[in-house]
Amino acid sequence: MTHITESEMKQKYLDLLSQKFDSAEKLATEIINLESILELPKGTEHFVSDLHGEYESFQHVLRNGSGNVRAKINDIFKDKLSQQEINDLAALVYYPEEKLKLVKNNFDSIGTLNIWYITTIQRLIDLITYCSSKYTRSKLRKALPEQYVYIIEELLYKSNEFHNKKPYYETLVNQIIELEQSDDLIIGLSYTVQRLVVDHLHVVGDIYDRGPKPDKIMDTLINYHSVDIQWGNHDVLWIGAYAGSKVCLANLLRICARYDNLDIIEDAYGINLRPLLTLAEKYYDAENPAFKPKKRPDKDVSLTKREESQITKIHQAIAMIQFKLEMPIIKRRPSFEMEERLVLEKIDYDNNEITIYNKTYPLKDTCFQTVNPNNPAELLAEEKEVMDKLLLSFQQSEKLRRHMSFLMRKGKLYLPYNGNLLIHGCIPVDENGEMESFEIEGERLSGRELLDVFEYHVRRAFDHKESTEDISTDLVWYLWTGKYSSLFGKRAMTTFERYFIEDKASHKEEKNPYYYLREDVDMIRKMLKDFGLNPDEGRIINGHTPVKEIDGEDPIKANGKMLVIDGGFSKAYQSTTGIAGYTLLYNSFGMQLVAHKEFNRKEKVLSMGADELSVKRVVDEELQRKKIRDTNIGKQLQDQIDILKILMHDRYLT
């Protein structure tokens, strides 16, 4: 290969660039355009976390921009429209197709319906004009429905100073109605408003878990205009399963069985569970109370006796496979320090008790039919065959491939963005606030360095799906369950104890000290510095742990340097948190934390226009309004400008 000097590489790059900008005028226009964009206000960032498969709640928060849509409507219409009209307009923007059907049923003549169309189109045009005021025309054009760009731009930028065009604009709207395009136009305008009120979405982890529709959330995110993801522990579990980890696969199947969500596997991703059911029915009892599926809060119809029986058996079968599969990993990776989790070896099968963490407990609801006491890690031939088939099906699911590839493309373990650190779980520390170190391939790592190496191994495992027992695949499982994992954030996962030990003290999972030290300002400053961020201006934005507002816990910690935005979309947590989750908005004026009430049904929003939103709390207000210049995108644009100016001086200025 020919050696190219840095100077030669620079010249080749400038040569390529000059083909696109082949005149001084074109180059100057681009520089002027980019320099001008830097002076615009920064766009609104929207932070959500811990979606846990709750598609309907997530959809609503996305459609209303955590209250941003209603705020914009209030800004321009509060003195012009009644509260009911504002509610109706908000509901139309959130759910345009459904709201249109309801509205049209209320009219008894075409004439009054047409007047409504004219009024509504104008209101939506006014709303878009207001919402797009900090965007370039080019950016707005990309947000408009493609088939109506010309018509909408004419209505947006109409100038009627001399009244010459009044008939033109009237005809434009009348023809839209006459040609029966008004419904589609209103739907397109409504989705444009949704898109304009949020410039960029951050999903701070856990799209997957116990909720019923993570696949629909993934489809929504794939089609979203601008998004990034910080992986959560449940997301990494799914990535691990797709990447070839059978123990990750067993874990997620167990969770789906426990929460009556196996239809995610079968219906959403098309994976055949019949071989697992056949195995389960051969060996396991339908009456084991510890393994009966939890009642799903979104299901109106209860499981039939037969369905409950099948799930209970599957639940036991996959749990035992999971405990067996964990053992070889723990033994071949002593650096994981997980010997206490060799639970099947610690059982006295004659006396039905276990000695764990130096304490002996009697066991209840046991189902050790397939365990060989002399070799507890040994899988039956049938168990091995079932797991081989399931892994193959998992890796061959086209929909799952698409979703996992998107998670890898848009996801990271952590993200420094616009001066803030976004991370789902924690940065492992000891009781003194020192970064905890963990050995990977002979090297001790901590802090940012540790997280970078974890992420490297997640990507390596994903790229080598055929390797199922390598260090990278094992580390993906460790991220799910290990004590130095930034995603798990606890000392041990007590799954076995919860199933088989009555004593609730054994169920306790001790959290990493990070979770109480994050109240300390100096601790947060130290972490921000370790991740290359300004400790005076930056914040950590965290998910993973539900904020128990009902007990007086505050999501704003360390004098506003730490923001915790999980409170849970997951219905299972809402009785302990007292709310249905936090989201965060960060616009050019500052940050607002939004606490949400439980989202019941969109029908209520459609009929009454009532939002399931509660309080917005101002986290801070910027002393000086932030511009695009102050953001990550601004830095990228400035780099482009610098290169273009070099080209200008190199080729066109003498």
From Swiss-Prot:
SUPFAM superfamilies for this protein: Metallo-dependent phosphatases
Gene3D superfamilies from the UniProt entry: 3.60.21.10
Cofactors demanded by this protein: Mn(2+)
BP-aspect Gene Ontology terms: gluconeogenesis
UniProt keyword annotations, A-Z: Carbohydrate metabolism, Hydrolase, Manganese
Reactions catalysed according to its record: beta-D-fructose 1,6-bisphosphate + H2O = beta-D-fructose 6-phosphate + phosphate
Highest taxon listed in the record's lineage: Bacteria
Pfam name, any one: FBPase_2
GO MF, any single term: fructose 1,6-bisphosphate 1-phosphatase activity
The protein's annotated pathway: Carbohydrate biosynthesis; gluconeogenesis
Family the entry assigns: Belongs to the FBPase class 3 family.
HAMAP family: FBPase_class3
Protein name: Fructose-1,6-bisphosphatase class 3
Name of encoding gene: fbp
